[in-house]
Amino acid sequence: MAFGSMNSGDDSPMSDINVTPLVDVMLVLLIVFMITMPVLTHSIPLELPTASEQTNKQDKQPKDPLRLTIDANGGYYVGGDSASKVEIGEVESRLKAAKEQNENVIVAIAADKAVEYDYVNKALEAARQAGITKIGFVTETKAQ
């Protein structure tokens, strides 16, 4: 047994560790953490927006995006189908002008399937330089 009398004459050290104080401390720490944890999870102050069932009439109308077309040879066309071919610098200036006219302008990039990605990347960079954040890509759906 680990507890012997003082007069036993056995000079060997006590081999068992008393774990009762360790368990007591751990249980107290567990209780403290359990109490403080809910307070810590809700410490971020947020003001969440409220939603209403009404929508603006303006939101119901579809927004006509500004079309940026890139042909197979890397030519850029800003606007409708009858638009003339422009260089990438002119693309950026036209996108800036469109952004000044309408703050929420949407750009739809229609790139040919065979165009190199570098041309698409330049168009995306021009839109970023113009401050446009709403960009979409035009694709065709497969006929079933």
From Swiss-Prot:
Pfam families for the chain: ExbD
Gene Ontology BP annotations: protein transport
Compartments in which it is found: Cell inner membrane
Gene3D superfamilies to which the protein is assigned, alphabetical: 3.30.420.270
Membrane topology annotation: Single-pass type II membrane protein
Cellular component per GO, a single term: plasma membrane
Superkingdom per UniProt: Bacteria
UniProtKB keywords: Cell inner membrane, Cell membrane, Membrane, Protein transport, Transmembrane, Transmembrane helix, Transport
Residues in the Periplasmic compartment per record: 40-144
Cytoplasmic side: 1-18
Transmembrane residue ranges: 19-39
GO MF annotation terms: transmembrane transporter activity
Oligomer and partners: The accessory proteins ExbB and ExbD seem to form a complex with TonB.
Family (UniProt): Belongs to the ExbD/TolR family.
Function: Involved in the TonB-dependent energy-dependent transport of various receptor-bound substrates.
Protein name as it appears in the record: Biopolymer transport protein ExbD
Organism, as annotated: Neisseria meningitidis serogroup B (strain ATCC BAA-335 / MC58)
